[in-house]
UniProtKB/Swiss-Prot annotation:
MF term (GO), any: pyridoxine 5'-phosphate synthase activity
Sites annotated Transition state stabilizer: 155
Pathway: Cofactor biosynthesis; pyridoxine 5'-phosphate biosynthesis; pyridoxine 5'-phosphate from D-erythrose 4-phosphate: step 5/5
Residues involved in 3-amino-2-oxopropyl phosphate binding: 11, 22, 199, 220-221
Organism of origin: Ruegeria pomeroyi (strain ATCC 700808 / DSM 15171 / DSS-3) (Silicibacter pomeroyi)
Protein name: Pyridoxine 5'-phosphate synthase
BP GO annotations: pyridoxine biosynthetic process
Keywords: Cytoplasm, Pyridoxine biosynthesis, Transferase
Length: 248
């Protein structure tokens, strides 16, 4: 049986982080998105946080106008963000947890605690044609809850796996990888499309990319950092190559 093409979503948030460190127009996240397309990205991910610390409303406007690949719009489950998503109608909306004090998204959404609210929150997004994804830990209870609320997609948080690898804690790394494998298969059995991301690097991407149920990986911070040394196009192209190699 042939394994489906594994999509690469390139997150451009931290191009905006560099821009906002000084202000002004450069580097331009939209230019980065166009380069990502040329380098093999199948989609672009951008997280409009409530505090606008990196991506801005104007960036979302520009991305919607400029992209020839789908936009995956990451956002918190707030009324403000829902209104923005309903106005733009991006291809995909990924609901993520958000805390003002965090540097980056620290964990998965606790769907099981907020099933009723989240079910009502995502319904209008689905009605206008957005594919709704929920960013969760590799936990059976959260996968089941995401399915019950009507999400079409889950994105599994790979951060614990990547952190354990970076720290040299290979027992934990292998345990986290097995949890990702099991929950990918379980979610797929429920009819959910499976994505994964957070903290993936050249060293950690291939074991996750090899899971046949995973249809998309969203990768950002590492690629933007690697671009300093080898350029954005080559950095993304190498990630694309590693993903394809793992899937072969």
């Amino acid at each position: 049986m042939s394994v489906p093409h594994l999509r690469l979503g390139v997150n451009i948030d931290h191009v905006a982080t560099v821009r906002n460190a000084r202000g002004g127009e450069y580097p331009d996240p939209i230019r980065a998105a166009k380069i990502a397309e040329q380098a093999g990205a199948d989609g672009i991910t951008a997280h409009l946080r409530e505090d606008r610390r990196h991506i801005t409303d104007a960036d979302i406007d520009g991305l919607m106008a400029a992209l020839s690949v789908p936009l995956n719009f990451e956002m918190a489950a707030t009324d403000e963000m829902q209104k923005i998503a309903l106005r733009h109608k991006p291809h995909a909306v990924c609901i993520v947890p958000e805390k003002r004090e965090e540097r980056t998204t620290e964990g998965g959404l606790e769907v099981a605690r907020e099933e009723n609210r989240l079910a009502h929150f995502i319904a209008p997004l689905r009605e206008v044609g957005c594919r709704v994804s929920i960013f969760i830990a590799a936990d059976r209870r959260q996968v089941e809850a995401a399915h019950r609320i009507g999400a079409q997609v889950i994105e599994l948080h790979t951060g614990a796996y990547c952190d354990a690898h970076a720290e040299g804690d290979f027992a934990t790394r292998d345990r986290e990888l097995e949890a990702l494998r099991e929950m990918s298969a379980f979610a797929h059995s429920l009819g959910l499309e499976v994505h994964a991301g957070h903290g993936l690097t050249y060293d950690t991407v291939q074991p996750v990319a090899a899971f046949p149920e995973v249809m998309e990986l969203n990768i950002g911070h590492f690629l933007i950092g690697e671009a300093i040394f080898r350029g954005l196009h080559p950095a993304i192209a190498e990630m694309r190559r590693l993903m394809d190699e793992a899937r072969a």
